[in-house]
Amino acid sequence: TLPGALPSIGGKPARILAMTHGFHGRTMGALSATWKPGIRKPYDPLVPNIEFVRAGDKVALHDAFAQTGLGRYGKGPVAAVILELIQGEAGVQPLGADYVKFVRELCDINHALLIIDEVQTGIGRTGKWFAFQRDDLSGGVTPDMVTFAKGVAGGFPMGGMIAFGEKLAALFTPGSHGSTFAGNPLGAAAGLATLGVIEDENLVANAEARGEQLRDGIMATGNPLFVSVRGR
């Protein structure tokens, strides 16, 4: 999904950085950015030049960018970083707003894209349409691309991607991306109906309220086994 966005330095292919414990799907491209070895191994070889950095580790991310260079041991440039604001596969672990801001800064400095996967967190689940709209999760960062699926059509197969800005949108020229079942009438109708119900019944705000109620209720039990409630 990044045609034309993968430059090279000295003939070295560009890289995409993904997070340890990240999960992005089971189709070939998404699986290539998914960390869990047990899921990946049966499908090797996967898409090359995707590297994993320790989630939440600023030093590791900085070092991954710093490996770009023209020298013998230098690597190609980083074209994009893909991450989830809350890692479900890691046990519902937020990356942290401060870390996400750091990722955005490094992407801007190095002319790399920031892709946020909102398949699990989008469509109102965190009390906002998208988790990146919550400053306590994203630090106010706006990604270059957002992916979404699942909740957008109420369980019917449907997914999509939002690209922000004319430069990024220009990468997708007619015929550069397609799918046999993309934009099918039944899926589109299911998506429109689902979004209509979410808006009409104010379900995004309700998710925020119910989340706070659940969090407060769990901690109010005083059970020593409960030390925190993660997620939103």
Outline where the language-model segments fall.
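Conserved N-terminal phosphate-binding loop of PLP-dependent enzymes in the Aspartate aminotransferase
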Residues: T1-R232
